[in-house]
Amino acid sequence: MAYNLKEVMANKPSRLTAGHRMCAGCGAPPIARMVLRALKPEDKAVISNATGCMEVSTFLYPYTAWTDSYIHTAFECAAATASGAEAAYKSLKKQGKLPENQEVKFITFGGDGGTYDIGLQSLSGAMERGHDMVYVCYDNGAYMNTGIQRSSATPRFADTTTSPAGSVIPGKMQSRKDLTEIMVSHHIPYVGQTIAVNNFKDLYEKSEKAIYTKGPAFLNVLSPCPRGWGYPTDMLMQINKLAVETCYWPLYELSLIHISEPTR
């Protein structure tokens, strides 16, 4: 069905407010803002955020840019934190301590360092257990917050502070990990790969599907970094456009078709 995204956005509150400290030209703020705008206005959210660029720039106690409940958690356990909160919510609802008609969604944000590497075990566990939550990876291809060190999301031959391109090596020598396909292999209900800007409808629609699909969902979102990638801050949209058009970052999604249990 055709719709006007600007009109939809105008009628929904921004759940990541202005005043955060993210860099100009960074892909992470529009990712968080658009993902959360996919929520229905009446629904509440619990945000779990791994340590990283987004966390240190949006939540500096006692200040916060988040309007929903927010949990800052360690690099390695953002998915585990969200899965625990989701399990507690279900238990409280079952006990009648929370209203049945109040929907709470559990959304986790983590960078590629906290998702591809340090937090992969807890992410895999949360997805396999079937928690009703969405994990959003904002993938900028390195540990940008701590000084642009390589991660397993860093492309081959990329220049980072721990894989410097020069006369000894031409940059990172290993190929990047395909985390989206790893999540597909978990056979979870929904997996999507999208971009920060340039195609807002794609990000919005995939976010909406992920949030309102029952069970675990995963979104891998390309999030260019002007400091780490070395582009002028006004080129964010062009960088995203090139990533898609060159098929470096193809846009796709997979929805698991529900198959009924066999009967005897």
Where are these regions (language model features)?
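Short, conserved beta-strand edge motifs with alternating hydrophobic and charged residues
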Residues: 137, 192-194, 218-222
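Glycine-rich, Lys/Arg-enriched anion-binding loops that position phosphate/diphosphate groups
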Residues: 198, 202, 211-212, 218-237, ...
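Cofactor-binding active-site loop characterized by glycine-rich and histidine/acidic residues
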Residues: 2-135, 148-158
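Conserved thiamine diphosphate
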Residues: 7-10, 99-102, 151-209
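Residue-level detector of conserved catalytic or cofactor/ligand-binding positions
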Residues: 255-263
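Short gly/pro/ser/thr-enriched loop/turn and capping motifs at secondary-structure boundaries
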Residues: 55, 140-145, 226-228
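Hydrophobic/aromatic ligand-binding patch that stacks against planar heteroaromatic rings
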Residues: 37, 125, 182, 209-210
